[in-house]
A protein has these predicted regions:
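Alpha/beta-hydrolase active-site loop
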Residues: 178-198
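Mobile cap/lid helix-loop segments that gate and shape the active-site cleft of serine hydrolases
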Residues: 139, 241-290, 296
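C-terminal catalytic histidine-bearing segment of alpha/beta-hydrolase fold enzymes
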Residues: 315-363
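Short substrate-entry loop that stabilizes the transition state in hydrolases
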Residues: 119-124, 129-171, 239-240
């Protein structure tokens, strides 16, 4: 395992990381291309002595794609009051609830834990928990990620794990995370909802994400300033151009630029062209283009034998965070898989210590 920090000794650390990891990762080009210029052709003159001056043609303001970060920042995420639907069996030192809240008028369900004991004067710190891809037709709120939620909840946090739209009993369509902002919208409304909850401290909110949930976490942290720190395990955290060309699954797989007609890649490329043809668009929908404005420090974890999400994604984000002069920690787990199963205990300890440092105690 390697532990990589950014801080005052960053130049020495970068040298160490490069030698430890092999070839230096390629940083995605986030420089937008200059917009095309437009020159109006003159109209022919009338045969009379009067010269006709053409009226200016109004230029339509392009409608931003819903995935664009500037479009997401312009939206409102009011959330709602939290409704306790079912009281579940408690944990060792925390209560468990099956709750609901509203997101774009949809009733979204979630699992929420609340510590037992006397509440701090400002309320309990919160961790918004973003799960990875689970087929919506088999998703169950109280299954999967049980040990993850338990360890964070035992450490004195409200844990709020949203069932994104179309998952479990949540209303709406499960349209995926990468072609629509829907799941991120549901999470941002979860943030707003938990801020209303009387036992929660609205100024001490962190976010945890695994795989697809890491994508949602990174996007959330460049859209809102409410998230004080983020922890991402095996995250889909590359820029969109890198998602197109570097996301390969399974041993021996190779990058492809020919996505299937049913994929989000094909749909976006058909409408907006490739990243080479339209870099401005692809950068505008990538959270990586906005790391200079991220809401807090980030901790990354990734197994070196992950066959679902490339280790390279976390490596790229690490260097991009450094370039943006943002605080980041990066842990690699030798020989471990997508769920970091072999080093789970150590990774969770580091996760909780990070949240304690930057969320619970606000250092």
């Amino acid at each position: 395992m390697n532990k990589i920090f950014t801080g005052c000794s960053i130049l020495v650390l970068i040298s160490f990381i490069v030698s430890a990891c092999g070839a230096s990762p390629v940083i995605a080009d986030t420089t937008p291309a200059a917009p095309p210029s437009f020159t109006a052709s003159p109209l022919p003159l009338s045969t009379t002595t009067e010269t006709l001056i053409p009226s200016p043609v109004p230029t339509a303001t392009p409608i931003p794609h819903p995935l664009e970060i500037r479009a997401m920042r312009a939206r409102e995420y009011p959330g709602s009051d939290i409704v306790i639907e079912t009281v579940l069996d408690p944990g060792v030192n925390y209560n468990r609830y099956y709750i609901s809240y509203l997101s774009e008028g949809l009733k979204i369900y979630a699992l929420m834990t609340v510590p037992m004991g006397e509440k701090p004067a400002t309320g309990w710190p919160v961790v918004i928990f973003n799960h990875g891809f689970i087929r919506p037709d088999v998703y169950v709120s109280t299954e999967r990620y049980i040990a993850y939620v338990d360890l964070i909840a035992r450490s004195g946090y409200i844990v709020f794990r949203s069932d994104y739209r179309g998952h479990g009993n949540s209303e709406g369509e499960a349209g995926g995370a990468y072609s629509r902002p829907d799941y991120t919208v549901d999470v941002l409304n979860a943030v707003a909802s938990v801020k209303r909850y009387p036992d929660a401290d609205p100024n001490r909110i962190g976010m945890w994400g695994h795989s697809m949930g890491g994508y949602i976490t990174l996007r959330s942290m460049v859209v809102t300033g409410d998230i004080k720190a983020g922890v991402i395990w095996a995250g889909v955290v590359a820029s969109y151009p890198d998602l197109l060309t570097r996301w390969r699954r399974g041993t021996g797989a190779t990058p492809t630029r020919t996505p299937s007609p049913s994929s989000w890649r094909f749909s976006l490329m058909q409408q907006y062209g490739s990243p080479e043809e339209n870099p401005e668009f692809w950068n505008s929908i990538s959270a990586n283009s906005y790391l200079g404005e991220i809401s807090g420090p980030v901790q990354l974890h990734h197994g070196t034998l992950d066959e679902d999400v490339p280790l390279e994604f976390s490596e790229l984000l690490f260097y991009q965070m450094l370039d943006a002069q943002q605080y980041v920690e990066f842990y690699k787990y030798e020989g471990d898989n997508h769920n970091i199963s072999n080093y789970f205990g150590q990774a969770m300890q580091r996760t909780i210590e990070f949240f304690d440092r930057y969320v619970k105690f606000g250092l």
